From Swiss-Prot:
Disruption phenotype: Enhanced lesion development after infiltration of leaf tissue with the programmed cell death (PCD)-eliciting fungal toxin fumonisin B1 (FB1) or the avirulent bacterial pathogen P.syringae pv. tomato DC3000 carrying avrB (Pst avrB). Enhanced resistance to the virulent pathogen E.carotovora subsp. carotovora SCC1. PANTHER family: KUNITZ TRYPSIN INHIBITOR 2, KUNITZ TRYPSIN INHIBITOR 4. SUPFAM superfamilies: STI-like. Belongs to the protease inhibitor I3 (leguminous Kunitz-type inhibitor) family. This is Kunitz trypsin inhibitor 4. The keyword Disulfide bond applies. Its main location: endoplasmic reticulum. InterPro entries: Kunitz_inhibitor_STI-like_sf, Prot_inh_Kunz-lg. Exhibits Kunitz trypsin protease inhibitor activity. Involved in modulating programmed cell death (PCD) in plant-pathogen interactions. Can inhibit both serine proteases and cysteine proteases. May be involved in the modulation of the proteases that participate in the hydrolysis of dietary proteins in the gut of spider mites. Induction: Down-regulated after root-knot nematode infection. Accumulates locally within 72 hours after P.brassicae butterflies oviposition. Induced late in response to bacterial and fungal elicitors (e.g. Pst DC3000 and Ecc culture filtrates), and upon wounding, salicylic acid (SA) and hydrogen peroxide H(2)O(2) treatments. Induced by infestation with spider mites. It comes from Arabidopsis thaliana. It is found in: Endoplasmic reticulum. One of its GO terms (biological process) is response to insect. Disulfide bonds join 66-112, 165-176.
Length: 215
């Protein structure tokens, strides 16, 4: 008695391959300045437009050292502190465009002894702004953690922007806001929700650079 072995139809594998390609094309990978797809590594966030500050770092507000806000270096030659991206729902290894994800400033230690995940803070009534601040690691998808989700979206041919879409449990289509730059009374360039986006590009950081960063 001869056993027959079932073989998969080649069309089945073709469908699987096409499905994977379509998924990656629907949500393209964010790429760095070398044109490489970005993954779970550290990257500097740099301005596309030169002469208006450098990379991103951490700073207090109103002359106080703590807690931290996310700010832009004043000098364009200073790349700041790299960031890491995580927690996107799409089942892909690369950092996807237009998907909610978490952003963490990748610093070894801080004098404020606090986590450095990005989140949108409470409304600053004095400055009439919603600033992007450093906060705790988001836990799950609860109401408070939703303040820590941002999207990276293409803006033109060679630039990206950060977008905040505050989806709540009872919201349909959330109203999205771009993340821009607000220059405060001390001249500090702070990330804040804005109708004028801060256009950026990403540069991969090496391990030595990341391990040496402290605040």
């Amino acid at each position: 008695m001869t056993k027959t072995t079932k073989t998969m139809n080649p069309k089945f594998y073709l469908v699987l391959a096409l499905t994977a390609v379509l998924a990656s094309n629907a949500y393209g990978a964010v790429v760095d300045i070398d044109g490489n797809a970005m993954f779970h590594e550290s990257y500097y966030v740099l301005p596309v437009i030169r002469g208006r500050g450098g990379g991103l770092t951490l700073a207090g507000r109103g002359g106080q050292p703590c807690p931290y806000d996310i700010v832009q270096e004043s000098s364009e030659v200073d790349e700041g502190i790299p960031v890491k991206f995580s927690n996107w729902r799409l089942k892909v290894a690369f950092v996807p465009e237009s998907q909610n994800l978490n952003i963490e400033t990748d610093v070894g230690a801080t004098i404020c002894i606090q986590s450095t995940y990005w989140r949108v803070g409470e409304f600053d009534h004095e400055r009439k702004q919603y600033f992007v601040v450093a906060g705790p690691k988001p836990e799950g998808f609860g109401q408070d953690s939703l303040k820590s989700f941002f999207k990276i979206e293409k803006s033109g041919e060679d630039a990206y922007k950060f977008v905040f879409c505050p989806r709540t449990c009872d919201s349909g289509n959330p109203k999205c806001s771009d993340v821009g730059i607000f220059i405060d009374e001390l001249g500090v360039r702070r990330l804040a929700l804005s109708d004028k986006p801060f256009l950026v590009m990403f540069k991969k950081a090496n391990v030595t650079e990341v391990s040496s960063k402290t605040m």
